[in-house]
Amino acid sequence: GDVIPVEYVMGLTTAKLTRVLIYGEDDEDTETLRLRYQESFNERAFAGNAKDYHDKTLGIAGVGAVKVIRAWNGPGTVKLVILDSVFGKATDVLIQTVQKEFDPNKDGHGDGLAPIGHAVTVDTVSEVTVNIAATITYDNGYDLNTCKPQIETAIEEYFAGLRKNWENQSKLVVRIASIDAAIMGVKGVVDVTGTTLNGGGNVELTEYEIPVLGVVTYG
């Protein structure tokens, strides 16, 4: 959409926002601050350990989650796999921003936040599209047209919850039972049967994959 500058910019005639490269972030809420404070007693960060990399990465604007991989390509190598602040796949711009902060040339010379001798590589996850098929029974006065937006919102919220928890899990699993429960929570839905994910059962992802919702087919 159109962008209106707050202050006068010489030579600017029009500006449009085409896509988001790095998401803005809301102020930290009280519960998040409390959890972060409690976690600070469980692990101690010092230069170059996993906790230090974790905390410094999350301190960079636009980063929502990170997994730190030590010695991923031999001694002295570190990989930071990140999500953006809405827990999606990071853009190239965000990856480059984090890379410049830690180790601009990936050579371990200590030109960024990483200690000398730590060659850091920043990467992001792969997205796995999950297509869903389900047969849904509706209550009197409801049908697909009236329930479809709420159904797909409920499924999206489940997927968003999985992505938000990615940092804390060794791998994510998209479960039929959880999708059925999300659908059943929609007003007007009385039953859901025969649910499949990508034509089969639960979808088990690798450690560095996150799910995104594909096509929902209604039986």
Where are the model-predicted features located?
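Noncatalytic linker/hinge segments flanking ATPase motor cores
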Residues: E25-E28, G110-G112, V173-A181
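An aromatic-glycine-centered, glycine-rich loop/turn in mixed alpha/beta architecture
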Residues: C147-G219
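Catalytic P-loop NTP-binding/switch module of NTPases
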Residues: G1-N42, Q99
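Generic structural motif
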Residues: L12-R19, V66, V192-T195
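Carbohydrate-recognition loop of C-type lectin domains
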Residues: N42-L172
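Glycine-centered loop/turn motifs
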Residues: G1-E7, G117, L205-L213
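Surface-exposed loop/turn and secondary-structure junction residues enriched for glycine/proline
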Residues: E7-V9, R44, V125, A133, ...
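Intrinsically disordered, low-complexity, polar/charged repeat-rich segments
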Residues: D29-T32, R36, S40-A45, N131, ...
